[in-house]
């Protein structure tokens, strides 16, 4: 089956397509895609992943045509608004 792996690195957005075996997990597909060689800053222990915009675990099984998304880490949220709503 075929799946794609996308990583929205601001410096070099990447989308890779790869052929994987039926029943392949998200993590296996990420490994097989080569994205970790292209983007060594990816840390699957710290970054969330999803399939078509929904968070999934690394051991989740895939279906033909799935798009795996590796999300950027949020390093800081700056709350600089002046309202008293929060």
UniProtKB/Swiss-Prot annotation:
Signal peptide: none annotated. Pfam families: Ub-RnfH. Belongs to the UPF0125 (RnfH) family. PANTHER family: UPF0125 PROTEIN RATB. This is Protein RnfH.
């Amino acid at each position: 089956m075929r799946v794609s792996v996308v990583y929205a690195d601001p410096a070099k957005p990447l989308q890779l397509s790869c052929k994987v075996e039926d029943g392949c997990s998200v993590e296996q597909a990420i490994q097989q895609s080569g994205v970790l060689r292209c983007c060594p800053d990816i840390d699957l222990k710290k970054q969330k992943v999803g399939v078509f915009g929904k968070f999934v675990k690394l051991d989740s099984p895939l279906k033909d045509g799935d798009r795996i998304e590796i999300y950027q880490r949020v390093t800081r949220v700056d709350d600089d608004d002046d309202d008293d709503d929060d």
